[in-house]
From Swiss-Prot:
Pfam families: NPL. Residues 252-262 have a biased composition (Polar residues). Probably mediates the deacetylation of lysine residues on the N-terminal part of the core histones (H2A, H2B, H3 and H4). Histone deacetylation gives a tag for epigenetic repression and plays an important role in transcriptional regulation, cell cycle progression and developmental events. Involved in the modulation of abscisic acid and stress-responsive genes. GO terms for cellular component: nucleolus; plasma membrane. Induction: Repressed by abscisic acid. Residues 124-269 are annotated as: Disordered. Belongs to the histone deacetylase HD2 family. Residues 140-188 have a biased composition (Acidic residues). Keywords: Acetylation, Chromatin regulator, Developmental protein, Hydrolase, Metal-binding, Nucleus, Repressor, Transcription, Transcription regulation, Zinc, Zinc-finger. It is found in: Nucleus, Nucleolus. The gene is HDT3. Residues 189-202 have a biased composition (Basic and acidic residues). This is Histone deacetylase HDT3. One of its GO terms (molecular function) is zinc ion binding.
Length: 294
């Protein structure tokens, strides 16, 4: 490596050739002295082949010099726009075939009075395990991969079992819902008409309460025991019933209580107004109610 520097005068581009297997490194550009106070900006150019590139802009007041990092390996030309002075380009040349140009640069800098940056003292350490340790580590890795694969298989199997369980539960729920629907449909069926009671049973309130007849459709009548005494209440004649309804509710009810059908053969109590259908019932009533009073 050798120092390199040129002066580029005004109005003329400077053509340069790095040479065979040589590189030119431009590191600094500075303006020359000026007799007149120049305030205009000065532009710097480098031309390589047919390409003209702007390096930078200098000014005597603000930027009289410029640091660059330009490396050229073939013919080039330097130029500027200053009409009253010269511009100086400096750097160094390097042999392109040199295997270690950095060492040459450091030596040149030290010779020029610059201290090169110290190289890092840290060395790369290659951590290499012994063969036995490497083999053991590979075995451990293989075992770990097998365990991971077995865990994955177990998780997949458990996932399949859970899916089957869920489908079974959904099927059972559907069966239960279908059974419930069948039960509801059976309950909604029209109930069978109950058998008509025997003629012997009394129906005194059939004309008074028509609503009771509707309820009788849903209730199975109980069979009457012929052995037990039965209280028979006479049903009034329709013509009499109509007269009672037109005459008033309270008068009709009083007349019903006072009427005793004699044609039915009822036995009446002499001490009170109660009637019975059999003599046995009358005797039981007399013993229970009136014998104690006598």
């Amino acid at each position: 490596m050798e120092f390199w520097g040129v002066e580029v005068k005004n109005g003329k581009p400077l053509h340069l050739d790095p040479g065979l297997d040589r590189l030119v490194h431009i590191s600094q550009v500075a303006l020359g002295e000026s007799k007149n106070n120049v305030t205009e900006p000065i532009q710097l150019y480098v031309t390589v082949g047919s390409d003209k590139l702007l390096i930078g802009t200098l000014s005597h007041e603000k930027f009289p010099q410029l640091s660059t990092e330009i490396v050229l390996e073939r013919n080039f030309a330097l130029s500027h726009t200053w009409k009253n002075g010269s511009v100086f380009f400096s750097g160094y040349k390097v042999d392109a075939s040199d295997p270690e140009p950095e060492d040459l640069i450091d030596d040149q800098l030290e010779a020029a009075g610059f201290k090169a940056a110290p190289k890092s003292a840290a060395k790369q350490v290659n951590f290499q395990l012994p063969n036995e340790d490497v083999k053991a580590k590979q075995d451990d890795d293989a075992d770990g991969s097998e365990e991971d694969s077995s865990d994955d298989d177990d998780s997949e199997n458990s996932g399949d079992e859970e899916e089957e369980k869920v489908t079974a539960e959904s099927d059972s729920e559907e069966d239960d819902s279908s059974d419930d629907e069948e039960d509801d449909s059976s309950e909604e069926e029209t109930p069978k008409k109950p058998e008509e009671p025997k003629k012997r049973s009394a129906e005194p309130n059939s004309s008074k309460n028509p609503a009771s007849n509707k309820k009788a459709k849903f209730v199975t009548p109980q069979k009457t025991d012929s052995k037990k005494p039965h209280v028979h209440v006479a049903t009034p004649h329709p013509s009499k019933q109509a007269g009672k309804n037109s005459g008033g509710g309270s008068t009709g009810e009083t007349s019903k209580q006072q009427q005793t059908p004699k044609s039915a053969g009822a036995f009446g109590c002499k001490s009170c107004t109660r009637t019975f259908t059999s003599e046995m019932g009358l005797q039981s009533h007399t013993k229970a109610k009136h014998s104690a009073a006598a």
